[in-house]
Amino acid sequence: MARIAGVNIPTNKRVEIALTYIHGIGPTTAKKIVTKLGIAPERRVQDLSDNEVLQIREAIDADYTVEGDLRRQVAMNIKRLMDLACYRGLRHRKGLPVRGQRTHTNARTRKGKAKPIAGKKK
């Protein structure tokens, strides 16, 4: 197994697909990396030489924020919004949808399981 950016990449998959296992690298970014380095996209990870794996590792380290650094950056951005007490920060703090979705009905994923309220008594 090749280890890139602290992630064990599956060896039996194509390079483009395997790179998407790294948090912060999607299909488009993986395609850019592979074409920039001149690696055939249909090649499997197990067929890559150590030098090619090293090139991929260096390209990712140089050009992209991935894994722990990216997670930390996103968490810090959310924390900054919460500290500013702006509208988006307050929504994050309350655990409600941030981007203007309705909450009268729906938003169950963000709000959590529905809390039962006393129904109409007969």
Curated annotation (Swiss-Prot):
The keyword Ribosomal protein applies. It comes from the Bacteria. InterPro entries: Rbsml_uS13_C, Ribosomal_uS13, Ribosomal_uS13-like_H2TH, Ribosomal_uS13_bac-type, Ribosomal_uS13_CS. Part of the 30S ribosomal subunit. Forms a loose heterodimer with protein S19. Forms two bridges to the 50S subunit in the 70S ribosome. One of its GO terms (biological process) is translation. This is Small ribosomal subunit protein uS13. Residues 95-122 are annotated as: Disordered. Keywords: Ribonucleoprotein, Ribosomal protein, RNA-binding, rRNA-binding, tRNA-binding. Belongs to the universal ribosomal protein uS13 family. The lineage of its organism: Bacteria, Pseudomonadati, Pseudomonadota, Alphaproteobacteria, Sphingomonadales. One of its GO terms (molecular function) is rRNA binding. The keyword Signal does not apply.
